[in-house]
């Protein structure tokens, strides 16, 4: 795998690797990260602590994907739910709002070091029941967040100053990548046309969203369609297509398109 790619789905083995009775679950990547973070940390912790822990979870997970750690050893899954090997993951558990929003904001990020291609296997422990010298502790990261540390400061405190937050635009299951800057009234081009076309398809399933001309010009009609979409899906209703809104629209577009194909 030459590039880091965010998978659309991963396969979670709900047990230890050699437990042949454990079930495999096919889970959307973002839903998996939200589940793990909700299982591993507290939603009331400082925002910077939540982000630091999510980044560590994502980087660890993407390392498993990138290196094909289990598949290269003959297993038919991506990762396990056993904390002796991987993260805690609980089927069908509830997701906390603060974690849900944080993952949507940074799901394409991971941690890297200079001259190392793959995402870093950022191991961690809770720091109370288990100690792990040289690795991040969850309660320690909470204390640093309380002191005002930023996510990268928290991470570098444990993993060293040569740790960096990286990102990838390679996202499976998404037809077109985020253009790099928010789209708003006055924006023009193919990215605007993409959003207009996708919102028009989504409006077939969510008729409150007004249809708009797919002309590549971001006018008030497009802003209104975006605002309505944001209101329906609990996003900030500002009529601006930033990172979070772009990928939410893209994900819904794929889902609605697939439903249409099978209906």
Question: What function would you assign to each model-found segment?
Answer:
Residues 1-263:
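Conserved, single-site charged/polar hotspot
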């Amino acid at each position: 795998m030459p590039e880091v790619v965010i998978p659309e789905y991963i396969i979670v083995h709900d047990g230890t690797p050699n437990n042949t009775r454990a079930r495999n679950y096919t889970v959307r990547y973002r839903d998996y990260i939200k589940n793990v973070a909700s299982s591993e940390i507290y939603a009331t912790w400082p925002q910077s602590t939540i982000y630091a822990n999510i980044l560590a979870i994502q980087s660890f997970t993407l390392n498993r994907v990138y290196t094909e750690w289990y598949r290269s050893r003959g297993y038919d899954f991506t990762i396990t739910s056993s904390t002796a090997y991987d993260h805690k993951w609980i089927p069908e558990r509830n997701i906390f709002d603060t974690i849900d929003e944080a993952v949507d904001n940074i799901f394409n990020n991971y941690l890297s070091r200079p001259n190392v291609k793959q995402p870093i296997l950022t191991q961690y422990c809770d720091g109370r029941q288990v100690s792990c010298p040289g690795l991040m502790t969850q309660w320690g990261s909470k204390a640093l967040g309380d002191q005002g540390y930023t996510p990268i400061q928290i991470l570098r405190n444990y993993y060293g100053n040569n740790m960096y937050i990286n990102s990838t635009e390679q996202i499976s299951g998404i037809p077109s990548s985020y253009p790099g800057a928010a789209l708003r009234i006055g924006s023009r081009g193919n990215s605007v046309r993409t959003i207009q076309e996708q919102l028009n398809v989504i409006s077939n399933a969510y008729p409150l969203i007004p249809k708009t001309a797919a002309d590549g010009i971001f006018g008030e009609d497009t802003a209104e369609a975006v605002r309505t979409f944001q209101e329906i899906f609990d996003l900030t209703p500002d009529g601006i297509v930033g990172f979070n809104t772009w990928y939410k629209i893209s994900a819904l577009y794929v889902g609605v398109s697939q439903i249409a194909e099978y209906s």
